[in-house]
Design a protein with these regions (language model features):
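Short, well-structured beta-strand/strand-turn elements
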Residues: 38-48
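Short, flexible, solvent-exposed loop/turn segments with mixed acidic/basic and small polar residues
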Residues: 4-12, 83-91
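Terminal, regulation- and interaction-focused segments at domain boundaries
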Residues: 7-26
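Terminal intrinsically disordered, low-complexity, charge-rich regions
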Residues: 13, 42, 134-135
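Glycine-rich, aromatic-bearing surface loops/beta-hairpins
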Residues: 95, 99-139
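Amphipathic alpha-helical segments
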Residues: 26-40
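Long, folded non-catalytic interaction modules
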Residues: 8, 23, 32, 67, ...
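Surface-exposed, low-hydrophobicity interaction/linker segments
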Residues: 46-80, 85
């Protein structure tokens, strides 16, 4: 009789997460973030989450890879084209900044800089592991 093997994959949540509240459109907010943090976030294809019952949810998505530090920065809108939330338990947050492979940047300093922008009402850092919908942030 053949044995069944079960493969379990553990997702990697090793990234920093900042939530931003803003009434600005994504491209205007992105411009302000680029100026304040000396980044070059660029719009790429929308981040899609498959939805079995309805049309796929698409979230505005920006990306920047710093070749010098090898850090990846992402700006993603928390609300889709279908008015669904990427992270429903944080429904007051309008955007998330995700930083992967961060070994140099002090997140609290980054949050402080973001809070000085006219386009940002407030910003918070989050522990990714505290979020129920954290798997939506794996891309």
């Amino acid at each position: 009789m053949a044995k069944k093997l079960k493969l379990e994959l553990e997702l990697d949540y090793d990234f920093d997460l900042i939530g931003i509240c803003s009434t600005y459109s994504d491209y205007r907010l992105c411009w302000g973030i680029n100026q304040a943090l000396n980044l070059k976030l660029e719009s790429i294809d929308d981040y899609c989450l498959e939805n079995k019952k309805e049309e796929d949810d698409k979230f505005s998505f920006y990306e920047y890879f710093d070749e010098q530090t090898e850090e990846s920065f992402y700006l993603v809108k928390n609300q889709s084209n279908n008015y669904k939330k990427l992270i429903p338990e944080q429904d007051k947050i309008d955007y998330f900044i995700i930083i992967k492979d961060n070994y140099e940047i002090e997140i609290d300093d980054l949050v402080t800089k973001l809070r000085t922008l006219d386009s940002v009402l407030t910003a918070f850092s989050f522990n990714v592991n505290d979020l129920k919908s954290k798997s939506n942030l794996i891309f």
